[in-house]
């Protein structure tokens, strides 16, 4: 009689930045069943269940935003193994190791390159992992471009009901298969429900590239300083994404740390780093332009403000929050305003579990469909080859450039001379790499702004 033998799922996550590693690793845990069974020939029945953990192997794609040791520690997500790889090295690894699930936590072009590279690497292979991809947070720009670059994965995760509807509309609109779109929620929501603190704490969640100009970033810092001086009884925190010299998902040309050096900061205003969840534990009012932290805050029912001072514009991303009830200005906050979020809007975003009478937006069940789809695909046996929408036929003037940036040919094979590491880099090479990254970040944060200002003269 066939019996079920439980085993741990083997999951691989490829990420290209600190936030995408966090999203990818937590998503892997959310969508992987706590128990996976495979059929074996046995005359005995076992009542044992599988270990609730998964075997998680992390791969960090080498590039400008490869997270530092400090950033990885701050995220706090543990993996059974974690190492830095080139694209070609990762593809080679995927032909050697057998995984059940592969999560591609990359920018759109990286996902597309890996889909074509994996399709080539797995040619003639009877089995392959379930391939999953998605977005780290709010999708407010380049919707069609980013989605079509992610097409071809078995599951394309949408972080809300609203996103799922938009994703399907894009795929169906170009004649692509939309069955991969799967509604979930952001995997890092959670934490204790909001309770008032003493002292009252205001947190401004800074973003690396929103707003972009020195004028706008200086304005926001000035208003934060003014708010702290106007309310000396409040603790005011400027929550920063990274320390000088580090990079995140988005390039930060004008760090707030640098701008703050020109201010005489009041005693009740501090610059802080650390895990956002831990900062939210002591937050009474979360203020941002369009950070995903707003959704984390709303999920915990913390009063949340999305600023309108610089306008409500697609370039800022705060247009995503139209209808949320959270839009307000610094003038309103200075006067003591606390917005009340719209329950229906919040439910459509997949946050604030159980906040509606219908139960929509329940976080506890948000990943159920994805888990079921992964389990179903794992039990089907041989999966079909990966078939992205973009091919040398559908996008002959676009796809080759996307793949070439990752040293892949139009058919997904490695280009001659593609960088690949067969062994761990020695101390000298590690120093050279760190120096190269430091030079790049220096150019982004110091040289580029100077050149831009000279061009404006």
Q: Where are each of the predicted segments found?
A:
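A short, charged/proline- and glycine-enriched loop
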Residues: 2-11, 53, 194-202, 457
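Active-site and donor-binding regions of nucleotide-sugar-utilizing enzymes
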Residues: 9-34, 47-48, 52-57, 61-177
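Conserved catalytic-core segment of nucleotide-activated headgroup transferases in glycan assembly
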Residues: 23, 189-256
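Conserved active-site histidine-acidic residue motif and adjacent donor-binding/catalytic loop
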Residues: 84-87, 270-278
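A nucleotide-sugar donor-handling region in carbohydrate enzymes
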Residues: 152-217
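Nucleotide-activated donor-binding/catalytic signature segment of Leloir-type glycosyltransferases, i.e.
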Residues: 252-274
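A donor-sugar binding/catalytic signature common to diverse glycosyltransferases
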Residues: 273-316
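C-terminal amphipathic helix plus adjacent low-complexity
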Residues: 334-457
């Amino acid at each position: 009689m066939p019996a079920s033998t439980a085993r741990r799922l083997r999951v691989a996550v490829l990420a290209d930045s600190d936030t995408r590693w966090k999203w990818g690793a937590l998503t892997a845990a959310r969508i992987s069943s706590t128990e996976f069974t495979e059929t074996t020939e046995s005359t005995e029945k076992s009542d044992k269940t599988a270990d609730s953990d998964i075997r998680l192997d992390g791969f960090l794609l080498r590039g400008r935003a490869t997270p530092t040791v400090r950033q990885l520690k701050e995220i706090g997500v543990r993996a059974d193994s974690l190492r830095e790889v080139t694209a070609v090295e990762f593809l080679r690894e995927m032909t050697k190791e057998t995984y059940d699930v592969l999560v591609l936590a990359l920018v759109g072009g990286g996902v597309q390159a890996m889909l074509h590279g994996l399709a080539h690497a797995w040619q003639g292979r009877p089995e392959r992992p379930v391939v999953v991809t998605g977005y780290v947070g709010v999708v407010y720009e380049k919707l069609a471009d980013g989605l079509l670059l992610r097409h071809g994965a078995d599951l394309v995760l949408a972080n809300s009901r609203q996103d799922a509807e938009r994703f399907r509309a894009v795929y169906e609109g170009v004649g692509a298969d939309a069955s991969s779109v799967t509604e979930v929620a952001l995997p890092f929501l959670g934490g204790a429900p909001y309770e008032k603190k003493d002292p009252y704490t205001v947190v401004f969640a800074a973003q690396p590239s929103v707003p972009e100009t020195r004028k706008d970033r200086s304005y926001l810092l000035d208003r934060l300083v003014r708010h702290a001086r106007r309310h000396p009884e409040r603790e005011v925190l400027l929550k920063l994404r990274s320390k000088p010299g580090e990079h995140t998902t988005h390039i930060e040309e004008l760090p707030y740390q640098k701008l703050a050096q020109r201010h005489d900061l009041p005693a009740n205003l501090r610059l802080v780093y650390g895990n956002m969840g831990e900062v939210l534990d002591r937050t009474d009012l979360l203020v941002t332009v369009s950070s995903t932290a707003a959704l984390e805050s709303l999920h915990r029912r913390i009063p949340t403000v999305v600023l309108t001072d610089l306008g409500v514009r697609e370039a800022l991303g705060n247009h995503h929050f139209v209808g949320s009830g959270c839009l307000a200005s610094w003038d309103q906050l200075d006067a003591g305003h606390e917005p009340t979020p719209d329950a229906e809007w919040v439910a459509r975003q997949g946050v604030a579990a159980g906040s509606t009478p219908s139960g929509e937006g329940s976080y506890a069940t948000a990943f159920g469909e994805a888990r079921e789809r992964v389990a179903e695909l794992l039990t089907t046996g041989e999966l079909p080859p990966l078939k992205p929408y973009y091919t040398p036929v559908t996008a002959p003037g676009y796809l080759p450039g996307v793949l070439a940036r990752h040293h892949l040919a139009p058919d997904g094979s490695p280009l001659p001379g593609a960088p690949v590491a067969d062994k761990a880099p020695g101390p000298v090479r590690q120093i050279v790499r760190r120096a190269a990254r430091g030079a790049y970040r220096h150019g982004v944060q110091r040289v580029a702004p100077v050149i831009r200002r000279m061009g404006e003269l």
